[in-house]
Amino acid sequence: MNTVRVTFLLVFVLAVSLGQADKDENRMEMLEKTEQGKSYLDFAENLLLQKLEELEARLLEEDSEESRNSRQKRCIGEGVPRDENDPRCCSGLVCLKPTLHGIWYKSYYCYKK
């Protein structure tokens, strides 16, 4: 009976000590995986940030192109009637006194220089 108790106690002590070692190993393994996960998340975050910055740059570039184009669209083109006091002829055009058809409508037009 005594040998059974000693054997049981010995097995119990070995199981507990090995279990503690496994617990420590598991803890270390979890810490390593967490650190790897953090580095992976940092990498993914940086990659996403780069893509967003590229997208933002493209959008801002398109906005600036649109604003340049929209200014040009606001000017008055060739052969379009306009008021005498409205100096919005497009670049390369000049406002002249009405001639020919402008005389009948008493409108000013933008003509090429």
UniProtKB/Swiss-Prot annotation:
Keywords: Disulfide bond, Ion channel impairing toxin, Knottin, Secreted, Signal, Toxin
Prosequence residues removed at maturation: 22-74
Disulfide bonds: C75-C90, C89-C110
Protein name: U11-theraphotoxin-Hhn1e
Family recorded in the similarity comment: Belongs to the neurotoxin 14 (magi-1) family. 01 (HNTX-16) subfamily.
One GO cellular component, as annotated: extracellular region
Region (Disordered): 60-87
Tissue distribution: Expressed by the venom gland.
Native species: Cyriopagopus hainanus
UniProt signal peptide: 1-21
Compartment list: Secreted
